[in-house]
From Swiss-Prot:
Annotated Pfam families: EF_TS
Source organism per UniProt: Trichlorobacter lovleyi (strain ATCC BAA-1151 / DSM 17278 / SZ)
Family: Belongs to the EF-Ts family.
GO molecular function: translation elongation factor activity
Name the record gives this protein: Elongation factor Ts
Function: Associates with the EF-Tu.GDP complex and induces the exchange of GDP to GTP. It remains bound to the aminoacyl-tRNA.EF-Tu.GTP complex up to the GTP hydrolysis stage on the ribosome.
Length: 311
């Protein structure tokens, strides 16, 4: 198949590889983007942490957590422009929706939109959205949300850069008085802050599927074979690389951003010892604003030409 410039550009953005390398990779795999990324990684030409993705759209991610910390939500609402995303009315609307989700616990977006709004039962959330669009003058979308409810623990959150990134974490604790303490809330916020910075894909290595692990091993094998190493040496090398892989993608095994002498698990264990309890991190969720959405881009040169009546 013919490889387009757009495909090459997308692969370059995803991997950081050179234009000719990207073109060759796409040709080798008949234009399959995911396979092209793997091809470049096997050749040592792409970073494992980079992923194909579209430019972010605008809007805001917000969190809401109950006063006692036993439940929390993360919500993303998109707008068309960054100008509106910084508007106080838009930000108030996002916070209202987050509070509603926390109170009413809808199962999905469809149920959320049909629910009577928690702040005014005479309106549905859909009506509230329509009114906000009319007042603010720009299209908006309630894109996604996630809800955590802690049994024998607490939920913590962290919002970065005014709503560009949001994280929700849940942990259990074997002492009720500690669960409701400010010190425990600080531990959760620290872990959430780390998650915002480090972008883990899984909580622990047990959560990594066999397929994902085998795919990584095959990439390591292919790269090692390029150096001419024998198979028995390759397998030993793979063992070390797999541990590094877990350290890159599993939250509990990542180097803790606020103390690089510890992993996140070691930070949690040290905090538990200090608080005189046992702490287990159960799950996390991370929203990056506009992740996976294609941003509407304008061609300034084309707009000028059109305005001048040129073609």
């Amino acid at each position: 198949m013919a490889i387009t410039a757009a495909q090459i550009n997308e692969l370059r953005k995803a991997t950081g590889a050179g234009m000719l390398d990207c073109k060759k990779a796409l040709e080798e795999v008949d234009g399959d983007m995911e396979q092209a990324v793997d091809y470049l990684r096997k050749k040592g030409l792409a970073a494992a942490s980079k992923k194909a993705g579209r430019a972010a759209t605008e809007g805001m991610v917000a969190a809401a957590v109950t006063a006692n910390g036993n439940a929390g939500v993360l919500v993303e609402i998109n707008s068309e422009t960054d100008f509106v995303a910084k508007n106080d009315k838009f930000q108030d609307f996002v916070k209202q929706v987050a509070d509603h989700v926390l109170q009413k616990n809808p199962a999905n977006i469809e149920e959320l939109m049909a629910q009577p709004f928690a702040g005014d039962a005479s309106k549905t959330v859909q009506t509230l959205l329509n009114e906000a669009i009319a007042v603010i003058g720009e299209n908006m979308q309630i894109r996604r949300f996630v809800s955590f409810s802690a049994d024998g623990g607490a939920v913590g959150s962290y919002i970065h850069a005014g709503g560009k990134i949001g994280v929700l974490v849940e942990a259990t604790c074997d002492k009720a008085d500690v669960c409701s303490s400010e010190a425990f809330a600080t531990v959760l916020k620290d872990v959430a802050m780390h998650t915002a910075a480090a972008s883990p894909q899984f909580l622990c290595r047990e959560d990594v599927s066999a397929d994902v692990l085998e795919r990584e091993k095959e990439i390591y094998r292919a790269k090692a074979r390029e150096t001419g190493k024998p198979d028995n040496i390759i397998e030993k090398i793979i063992g070390g690389q797999v541990n590094k892989f877990y350290g890159d993608i599993c939250l509990l095994e990542q180097v803790y951003v606020k103390d690089t002498d510890k992993t996140v698990q070691q930070y949690i264990d040290a905090s538990a010892k200090q608080l005189g309890c046992s702490i287990t991190l159960k799950r996390f969720a991370k929203f990056v604003l506009g992740e996976g959405l294609e941003k509407k881009e304008s061609d300034f040169a084309a707009e000028v030409a059109a305005a001048a009546g040129l073609k």
